[in-house]
């Protein structure tokens, strides 16, 4: 299932991420494979997402993030370049779901691209924020 089909709002967000990645590349802010982009997608999730089979085994986050149970994120793929993400975001990143145990995530779309590893810092950094503050969260870090 292509997760962007029939979800114009989600597609617009992912295309915005691609545009930002293009700017990061052009400005030289993300060296080679450096830099992470993660966007919270939970508000764009549809009922069809919950039963979607995982494309990966559960992957350990490195800490427990109970406030993010069941949340969805788009994350740039590890070893993926910003310029390539700008051209084809779903081939250079993936949509992940935080598992019910809050200590693992699984890749659900569109391909099994291993995401960058900033989830523990994102989760710990926002643990004190009310969920309403998290309606759209974008994180970019340079290495």
Predicted segments with their positions:
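Flexible, acidic/histidine-containing loops and adjacent segments that form or flank the divalent-metal
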Residues: 1
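An anion-binding catalytic pocket shared by soluble metabolic enzymes
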Residues: 4, 11-130
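Active-site-proximal loop/helix of nucleotide/amide-processing enzymes and allied scaffolds
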Residues: 130-143
């Amino acid at each position: 299932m292509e997760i962007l089909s029939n979800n114009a709002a989600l597609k617009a967000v992912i295309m915005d991420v691609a545009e930002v990645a293009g700017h990061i590349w052009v400005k030289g802010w993300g060296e080679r494979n450096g830099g992470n982009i993660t966007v919270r997608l939970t508000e764009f999730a549809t009922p069809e997402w919950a039963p979607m089979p995982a494309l990966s085994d559960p992957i350990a986050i490195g800490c427990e993030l109970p406030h993010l149970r069941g949340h969805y994120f788009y994350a740039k793929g590890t070893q993926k370049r910003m310029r390539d993400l700008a051209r084809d975001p779903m081939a250079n990143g993936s949509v992940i779901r935080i598992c019910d145990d809050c200590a693992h995530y699984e890749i659900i779309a569109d391909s099994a691209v291993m995401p960058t590893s900033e989830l523990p810092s994102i989760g710990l950094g926002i643990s004190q924020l009310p969920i309403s503050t998290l309606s759209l969260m974008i994180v970019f870090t340079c290495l």
